[in-house]
């Protein structure tokens, strides 16, 4: 944090939120993202390096053949080898990632309005509940429908390409370190995709796919449009390179039973009490 930038109305007094620098970072990172979709961004050597780390799960039968990867983004957003099959009734995780429980009752109307910028449905989630997945670079970076429903809103909100957190002084390690926050604050600044569904069992739910840091790319499947009837487990979209979060918002009368900081896989069962 910089003292000179305090009291300027920035989300955090850091240069990445200063408008001129934020615009340049956004332009630079978009250009970088375009390059990461070219063949020059990918080499066989990168695949062999990734194979040595079991967290990528490349030596399992989970993912498609690497012959389909012709760019870094092809690899990063790699498909599953077989279509996702959801054997559960009820709600399932829309993605891989670490699950975090977040009470929306501590989030102001203004913050939700920022997160769902311009949505006519934003007020129905105030006082409700939210859950939040943080995706790691090793995770599967496509996201799927957590339940069946009808799309009533689907769009992408362009944001700035900031760091998705703050830099703090770690007195124990005697160095500055990056601290990602689990609140809905910084997500309201990032590029994000907003999908709101009307569901039979859970009322209206919002799925917010947040592209955090650097490229911040959220790509919806072309078939996902307002009025589309979605099946549980259906692929909704993907993240290209950059940090990735998924948030789900529920109406006020829904109760969730979740285990905080729990690693999950896409399609894994969630406990939602009607």
Locate each region found by the language model.
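Contiguous, well-folded functional domains in the mature portion of proteins
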Residues: 1-274
């Amino acid at each position: 944090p910089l003292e000179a930038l305090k009291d300027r109305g920035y989300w955090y007094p850091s240069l990445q939120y200063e408008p001129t620098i934020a615009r340049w970072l956004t332009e630079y990172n978009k250009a970088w993202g375009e390059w990461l979709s070219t063949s020059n961004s990918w080499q066989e050597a990168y695949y062999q390096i990734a194979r040595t780390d079991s967290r990528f799960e490349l030596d399992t039968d989970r993912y498609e053949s690497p012959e389909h990867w012709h760019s870094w983004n092809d690899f990063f957003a790699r498909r599953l080898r077989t279509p996702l099959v959801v054997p559960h009734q009820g709600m399932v995780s829309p993605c891989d990632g670490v699950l975090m429980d977040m009470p929306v009752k501590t989030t102001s109307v203004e913050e939700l309005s920022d997160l769902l910028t311009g949505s006519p449905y934003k007020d129905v989630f105030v006082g409700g509940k939210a859950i939040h997945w943080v995706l790691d670079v090793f995770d599967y970076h496509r996201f799927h429908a957590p339940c069946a429903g009808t799309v009533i809103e689907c769009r992408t909100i362009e944001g700035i390409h900031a760091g998705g957190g703050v830099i703090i002084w770690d007195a124990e390690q005697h160095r500055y370190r990056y601290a990602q926050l689990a609140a809905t604050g910084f997500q309201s600044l990032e590029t994000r995709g907003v999908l709101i569904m009307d569901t039979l069992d859970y009322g209206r739910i919002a799925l917010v796919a947040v592209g955090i840091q650097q490229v911040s790319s959220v790509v919806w499947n072309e078939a996902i449009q307002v009025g589309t009837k979605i099946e549980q487990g259906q692929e909704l979209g993907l993240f290209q390179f950059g940090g990735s979060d998924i948030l789900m918002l529920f109406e006020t009368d829904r109760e969730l039973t979740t285990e905080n900081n729990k690693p999950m896989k896409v399609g894994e069962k969630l406990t939602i009490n009607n």
